[in-house]
Amino acid sequence: MKVIVGLGNPGSKYKETKHNIGFITLDEIAYRQNVSFNNSNFEADIAEFFIGTEKVLLVKPLTFMNESGRSVGPLLTYFGVDEEDLIVIYDDLDLEIGKIRLRQKGSAGGHNGIKSLIAHLGTNVFPRIKIGIGRPSKNDTVIHHVLSTFPKETHEEMLLAVKKAADAALYACEGHTFVETMNQFNGK
């Protein structure tokens, strides 16, 4: 079983914000797979489908970004899923809008959702797909930047990054190792 987690905040207020790019990407995957999200006992909305014989869960934690691990940790334990079968998709300030970067492990890098996952999983070794949201302008704060929507002029680049991230996540679920997936999608 593979588990793809998109990080974001629940509620219509946050639906199209930069911080919700993980949720937006899971919506793209769900659309492609023709599946819908349902509420679960894990403080998350979950959709499921199969790629061949591989069951895939799409997970949107409903705990708000900073408590994502509270949802994901128990879910992985319940389903007996190891961290290497987890893929986390989230926003990254250090990447330009339209860019993605795949990593097998790493620190939280100041991202509170990842910090929560590391704390609840007890490891920083899990595959991740980072989607660029760019840095705030000099007159903007990080909090305002991540909780704002994408400027209209960057919408096309954002959608392209979402599609690339969805492609990468699905590729990893098709029997490819995450190293193969990184080689296929990093720098493209």
UniProtKB/Swiss-Prot annotation:
Intracellular or extracellular location(s): Cytoplasm
Residue sites binding tRNA per the record: 14, 64, 66, 112
Feature type site, description Discriminates between blocked and unblocked aminoacyl-tRNA: 9
Site entry: Stabilizes the basic form of H active site to accept a proton: 91
Record's keyword terms, sorted: Cytoplasm, Hydrolase, RNA-binding, tRNA-binding
Its EC number(s): 3.1.1.29
GO MF entries: peptidyl-tRNA hydrolase activity; tRNA binding
Matching InterPro entries: Pept_tRNA_hydro, Pept_tRNA_hydro_CS, Pept_tRNA_hydro_sf
Residues at the catalytic site: 19 (proton acceptor)
Superkingdom assignment: Bacteria
Record GO biological process: protein quality control for misfolded or incompletely synthesized proteins; rescue of stalled ribosome
GO cellular component terms given for this protein: cytoplasm
Main location: cytoplasm
Catalyzed chemical reaction(s): an N-acyl-L-alpha-aminoacyl-tRNA + H2O = an N-acyl-L-amino acid + a tRNA + H(+)
Subunit organization: Monomer.
Family statement drawn from the similarity comment of this UniProt entry: Belongs to the PTH family.
Function field: Hydrolyzes ribosome-free peptidyl-tRNAs (with 1 or more amino acids incorporated), which drop off the ribosome during protein synthesis, or as a result of ribosome stalling.
Annotated protein name in UniProt: Peptidyl-tRNA hydrolase
Organism for this UniProt entry: Enterococcus faecalis (strain ATCC 700802 / V583)
